[in-house]
Design a protein with these regions (language model features):
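Noncatalytic carbohydrate-binding groove/subsite architecture in carbohydrate-active enzymes
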Residues: 1-147, 209-219
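Short loop/turn motifs at secondary-structure junctions
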Residues: 15-16, 49-50, 159, 263, ...
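Structured core elements
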Residues: 20-21, 55, 115-116, 164, ...
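Generic recognition of flexible, low-complexity loop/linker segments
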Residues: 42-43, 101-106, 149-153, 180, ...
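Residues that line or immediately flank small-molecule/substrate-binding pockets and catalytic motifs
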Residues: 58, 167, 271
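Glycine/Thr-rich phosphate-binding loops of Rossmann-like dinucleotide-binding domains
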Residues: 64, 173, 248
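Aromatic/acidic polysaccharide-binding cleft in carbohydrate-active enzymes
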Residues: 68, 111-235
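C-terminal beta-sandwich/jelly-roll accessory domains of carbohydrate-active enzymes
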Residues: 207-221, 233, 241-308
Length: 308
């Protein structure tokens, strides 16, 4: 990397090159430690390690943690596997926290972005398709992993500067599927669409009180995930996921700017069975809808999140 960054130079001052160093695979914290130490031990701190980003690579495998030959079906899975998949998706929070803590030792001002270069569910390819093309279906399980992960990224946006779901169309946890001249939107597409209002906005501090969980044993994880932002016009966006297959969740959103009055201008959601997915024959099984299960309160808004 030192050789690379030496010869890749900023020739256009108004178009700076962002240099991203190859970072850890999943939980290889020693790699992060050695990379940061190597660069900062021989570099003026103002140059933040001669890098603008450090990559992080993590996929969610539904059935096995390390056997890439048995990843599990994209559409045919049990409730136990559903929660196991969500718990493995939730591991992204720990990865960001622990790699971020190491980066903080050397880069407390967070000049170096953590670049999550590949993330998402990686399941078995669809039967009858070319294994090399990595074509898989996309269900409400994918949507919840996407929503949970994007909320995690949002809440760590001071360190996570870029993240790339793998991949956009027809490969792994994609947002679109095509067949010739046909194209359908996946449940993951709608998650990205609903969360678009966070783009360009400022993150607001938020937290959940109550501690409800879903799953059990090693697959237990928080029931609700959230993130909140405010745009330049003062519009606040709140995104929430309910990871439960069984029960809805009442959430009383309290906004703390004293004296301000808030009302809901738009509310959208998706829901469906855990294996609900769109096909070319039925392209709108999972679709974005108007959300009406809310009421304005003196301090914000109260919502009832449906189960998956």
């Amino acid at each position: 990397y030192r050789r690379y960054q030496t010869y890749v130079r900023n020739y256009a001052g108004n178009q700076p090159i962002n240099k991203i160093c190859c970072g850890p695979n999943v939980d290889d914290y020693e790699w992060t430690k050695k990379v940061m130490a190597t660069f900062f031990d021989h570099c003026d701190p103002k140059l933040h390690g001669l890098m603008d980003g450090l990559s992080l690579h993590y996929y969610t495998l539904p059935e096995t943690e390390d056997d890439w030959n048995i990843k599990g079906s994209a559409t045919d899975f049990t409730e136990d596997i559903f929660y196991q998949t969500l718990k493995r998706g939730y591991f992204m929070e720990e990865l960001i926290n622990r790699h971020g803590a190491i980066m903080d030792e050397y880069d407390p001002d967070k000049n170096i972005g953590l670049i999550v270069d590949e993330w998402g569910i990686w399941s078995d390819v669809e039967p009858g398709t070319n294994p090399g093309f990595l074509y898989q279906q996309n269900t409400m399980r994918d949507a919840l992993v996407a929503g949970m992960t994007l909320n995690i990224f949002n809440k760590h946006s001071d360190r996570v500067k870029m993240a790339c779901i793998a991949q956009l169309i027809n490969v792994l946890q994609s947002v679109m599927l095509t067949d010739g001249d046909k194209m359908i939107k996946t449940p993951t597409y709608y998650v990205f669409h609903m969360m678009r209002h966070h783009q360009g906005a400022a993150l607001l501090d938020s937290s959940l009180v109550g501690g409800a969980t879903v799953g059990s044993g090693k697959n237990e994880l928080p029931k609700v995930f959230e993130s909140v932002s405010e745009d330049k016009d003062g519009v606040i966006t709140v995104t929430l996921t309910n990871n439960s297959l069984e029960s809805s969740e009442d959430v009383d959103i309290m906004l703390t700017n004293e004296g301000d009055k808030y009302s809901v201008s738009e509310a959208r959601y998706i829901e469906g069975a855990m294996d609900a997915h769109n096909t070319f024959e039925a392209p709108e099984v999972v679709d974005e809808k108007n959300f009406t299960a809310f009421e304005n309160t003196q301090t914000g808004v109260k919502v009832t999140l449906p189960a998956c």
